[in-house]
Amino acid sequence: MRPYKLPQKALIAEIFNSDDRFRSTTKEVEAVEQERAVIVGMDNDEGYDTLEELNELAKTAGALVVGKVRVRRRTIDNATYVGSGKANELSLMGSELEADLFIFDDELSAIQLRTLEETLGARVIDRTTLILDIFAARATSREGKLQVELAQMRYRLPRLIGQGQVLSRLGGGIGTRGPGEKKLEIDRRRIRRRVFELETELSEIEKQRGLRRESRKANRIPLVALVGYTNAGKSTMLNALTDSNVLAEDKLFATLDPVVRKITLSGGTEALLSDTVGFINKLPHDLVEAFKSTLEEVSNSDLILQVVDISCPYHEKQMRVVDGVLESLHAADIPRIIVFNKADAIPSCDLPAESENRLNVSALCGTGIEKLLSAVELKLNSARTEVDILVPYSKYEAVSMIRDRGMLLSEEHTETGTHIRALLDAESIGQLRKILDF
């Protein structure tokens, strides 16, 4: 029998066998590529397990966590973070566990990075580098990629001093991905030049964002910003509120690029809902700075919905982290509704008491969504004043302005003009006074 004339059954069997061999090889390659990591952090008295959060971050980045080490020290060692004795212990542990990578729960200086890599004989990254790496993997828009690269460059620049050996290992692995990765011979001058290029390009993008913001203000469409700790369920909440299909995953930083959806509330009020990047404990300063233009959407919002994962044992600590970020964005005084999400995941007797500004909701099940929408409309309209006015037909532009900038409650045409009842903000009322001379 000629080799190219196999019976059909044998041919099909061979195809399936080849497919199985390919899948097996792919899994083996993936298993080899998955880095074995040991995570290290300082024990704290905050009642909040930051090391467990670091563990989730490492998994999100694709690492296989093979060891966790909590270190109790009064002060952080300037050279090794954990002290020379503990560093030697970690070196032995890394050898036993065949670790490729050590991830530390706090930012490390250039000296600490260099000393630890020499002592441990493996790659070393810190929490900030890990978070930046996740952002690099998740960024999809042009602006998002530029912002991540800028944050990476700014973070690496002061850590170049005396790090020739460290930088020579930037050829791959967790903490080296994304647009921030450059050739091995990267130096301070090239980084500074690249930072300037990124800042210039992002400045142009920000101008376009500013124009859109001004257009929104001119149309008087209020902006409602969804904020919260990462994985609190903001994207699921946006989908529930707007009946849309934004990607919602049970992962840290599933949403990176901002998403805006328009919604018309039951009373006729139109609003824009914005889903922003999630916050996290020890959020890198360079990341906040790089994403400043995106986060300014929160600062310019008319109402903030702070989404809280009520099922998380550390939700109160997470709320304080979010409060701190909002404070840094000068957004702490913006009207806010606290939305305790995932209320279906805990017994009703354990849910917090509700009030006008604190509601229990399950975005996944839809429980409490209508109540939340009503609260949003009430909040938005509370900043408006009801006007009851007769607009002469000769001043009909006033009617158009009210329709465009306010919420029309009633409109009746009479012999002398149009009788209107509407909700308007202070600026629009001032404009109306100018048109009607009253």
Describe every region a protein language model picked out.
Residues 1-131:
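N-terminal accessory targeting/assembly segments
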Residues 1-38, 55, 158-232, 238-239, ...:
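C-terminal-of-GTPase-core extension/linker across diverse P-loop GTPases
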Residues 16-29, 48-52, 75-92, 257-258, ...:
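Switch II of P-loop NTPase G domains
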Residues 20-22, 209, 216-222, 240-271, ...:
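Switch I (effector-binding) loop of TRAFAC-class P-loop GTPase G-domains
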Residues 26, 51-59, 91-96, 107-122, ...:
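Conserved C-terminal guanine-recognition region of P-loop GTPase G domains, centered on the G4
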Residues 39-43, 68-71, 103-105, 306-309, ...:
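Conserved beta-strand segments of the P-loop GTPase G domain that flank and frequently precede/overlap
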Residues 43-46, 73-75, 107-110, 129-132, ...:
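Conserved nucleotide-binding/hydrolysis micro-motifs of P-loop NTPases
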Residues 129-150:
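Short alpha-helix plus adjacent loop in nuclease-associated cores
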